[in-house]
């Protein structure tokens, strides 16, 4: 092993590995599947091929000037993906709620404002040492206790005893900042998904909030603002990597059990807090590491970690980042320490971090591990800013913040010409033009047809259908995410035949026979397939729209039919609406169970992550604005639902209908809305 990579052996009891299993276990399962049979998973194979194609031209910058240009562009792209950051910061309004006195340090329970009305809970571990101190921001991963968790406490206590001012914070939606007041709530899947429509993914909010934590550190008289570091493990490692890359006030950055490659995420189940929409369309993880240069960077990996965080994947990114550090005459950075261990932030990892922070924030030592001083941990409840149920009643949760921002966006929204709105939808969905997609039509029996569809390289879809009874009759394109044998599909076929129209059944990619195994995480039935699509900058909903448009165009070209209407229920309902809204060659839609708004102050329930298109509320509008683009073509809505999957009551249904009716004007008979289950 190269001299810049340190291997540390660690024997530890399983009981010390306290990990949030609902996150890591799916990751490990998917990581195993990665090596077993990728060919058996056509959608995953397609995603990986697409990612590899996007990044095949990556090469080290020729010189420092070339890197500076790449760096500027990448920062612009990242800020765009994160939805931008406020130009003016909300006042910190910091308050110390309580102080715990300990022999070598004191622990202060602190809250401060990061965004208007949004407060971060934190703990400051303040050494009893005079003079300006180096400081370390400790961010947590997906351990249930967040900043209170023993894994986080251990490094806080160790750093404080070694003379560092330490600030441990709760991430938005986790720890004391969860929806409920008990520790252990998960901020990912359909909780974090509420942020996508407003264009503010959780990964970006974490970067901004960790920057506000630095603002707080700089406000403390005990802290030397020129000597600040950041560290965390797992999801906290991702926070460390991104915040360290973005905020140059961090002089030493130490992500733990988190660095790998973006392409390794494709096949794993990772938290929404780790997703940067479109990241693979702009870069690989190595370039994020390179953004830290010329500041100090230590990466700690575990030999028994999941594939996406594995030693080998981390080594790929480190190797690709090292040429950038060399441009600054820093060939020994980034440092890579490998610990024989499962996913963790254990004592050998902490000791490696202590040596690194001591070297780069104190100017002492060579960066070799420093033995951990004796530490005492607190009861998690004793560290809480708001123990038990004492949190203020007006506390703003993550979904409530998303809903507040969404309402503000809609209130300030200006009407857009239909052509511009269609263009915006096309861009937000990642491009839905059929492009070079092809299809071959065969007739296995009189009056029936099969369409072998190749929408993109590496993908093949098969449609079955029945011809219209005459050239004057229409055709219903039935969209399903539950397989062509589902009872609802059979019923739609029967209704079409009774009306004399033809029908075709399209199984949406990544569903039915192409369903991704283990796709559901929590309330998100399509968590992994939708997440992988976001990494590519191609929301899964947009891929469905592309397939729908290609199918409709080929059917119109190859079959005698007077019109093509879309029929959808549940999965694919918003994709159907978006397809007919964008493509004026589709003649209408009959949709059951359509989500009626992206605005939700609670986690989504009964919805698809695929439909939570990043930035759609900000740049286009709500579901109603998309629906208006269908006019004057027929649109029939049955049992539309709330963001929590509940049918609209009569009053809400009437309100929705009244909002839509002006778009149809003299064609009101073409707009139908039926409430209920």
Regions found by a protein language model. Name each.
Residues 213-281, 551-621, 625-626:
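Primarily recognizes the serine-hydrolase "nucleophile elbow" in alpha/beta-hydrolase
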Residues 36-119, 293, 300-474, 482-493, ...:
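Alpha/beta-hydrolase-fold serine-hydrolase catalytic core, especially in secreted/extracellular enzymes
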Residues 18-31:
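Bacterial N-terminal signal peptides
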Residues 170, 231, 256-257, 300, ...:
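Alpha/beta-hydrolase-fold catalytic nucleophile elbow
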Residues 132-134, 162-165, 224-227, 248-252, ...:
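Loop/turn elements at helix/coil->beta-strand transitions in domains of secreted/extracellular proteins
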Residues 1-17:
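N-terminal secretory signal peptides that target proteins for export/translocation
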Residues 231-235, 240-251, 255-262, 269, ...:
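Catalytic-domain carbohydrate-binding cleft regions of carbohydrate-active enzymes
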Residues 131, 136-219, 259-271, 478-554, ...:
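Cap/lid segment of the alpha/beta-hydrolase catalytic domain
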